[in-house]
Amino acid sequence: MTKTESKQLEVLRFIHERVQDKGYPPTVREICEAVNLSSTSTVHGHLARLEKKGLLQKDPTKPRAIELTPAGLTAIGATPQKIPVLGVVTAGVPILAVEEATDYFPLPPSLQTEQDLFMLTIRGESMINAGILDGDEVIIRKQSTADNGDIVIAMTAEDEATCKRFFKEADHYRLQPENDTFEPIILNEVSILGKVVGLYRDRM
């Protein structure tokens, strides 16, 4: 291992430890001080190379939004937590829910501290205005309640599951699609399976 590669592993470990400890990644200056680098530009160079290697990923829309990929976690000897993929749920006409794990998905580091998570594959286009597309996989936190406006996985009285935005109104519940071509689902009773807290899209 070269000196540069060794330093990059130090950077990865520090980012991972900070996210585990604080719940958010360090600043570039904090990385600089923690791994004894001479300048922030050197840190930026390491981060760019780590991202190119597929060991780190950044969200360009958010400041400091950097996290280790599953490959990055493997590189530092950390085992990524995995969550069950429980099949398909519809963003359209409700379909029967089947709670059997079809696969296990490595959890993004930003959600490693979360409990009781599972994943479902979306079928349909009723949530496209919320950025949830056909074929996307959504990460759901198990919970039986929701606030107005939350995107949830809900069960209807017929034991059918659907992904919609939740609203409790005067004498009913409204499961609102995010696509103007779909009608809302109005129910007297609804069972919440969980709240959508993340999304994964295969870009291949």
Swiss-Prot record:
Its EC number is 3.4.21.88. It holds the Pfam family LexA_DNA_bind. The active site is at S126, K164. One of its GO terms (molecular function) is serine-type endopeptidase activity. The record marks A91, G92 as: Cleavage. Residues 28-48 bind DNA. The keyword Transcription applies. It catalyses: Hydrolysis of Ala-|-Gly bond in repressor LexA. GO terms for biological process: DNA repair; DNA replication; negative regulation of DNA-templated transcription; proteolysis; SOS response. CDD domains: HTH_ARSR, S24_LexA-like. Keywords: Autocatalytic cleavage, DNA damage, DNA repair, DNA replication, DNA-binding, Hydrolase, Repressor, SOS response, Transcription, Transcription regulation. It is an enzyme of class 3 (hydrolase). Belongs to the peptidase S24 family. Represses a number of genes involved in the response to DNA damage (SOS response), including recA and lexA. In the presence of single-stranded DNA, RecA interacts with LexA causing an autocatalytic cleavage which disrupts the DNA-binding part of LexA, leading to derepression of the SOS regulon and eventually DNA repair. Homodimer. This is LexA repressor. It comes from Latilactobacillus sakei subsp. sakei (strain 23K) (Lactobacillus sakei subsp. sakei).
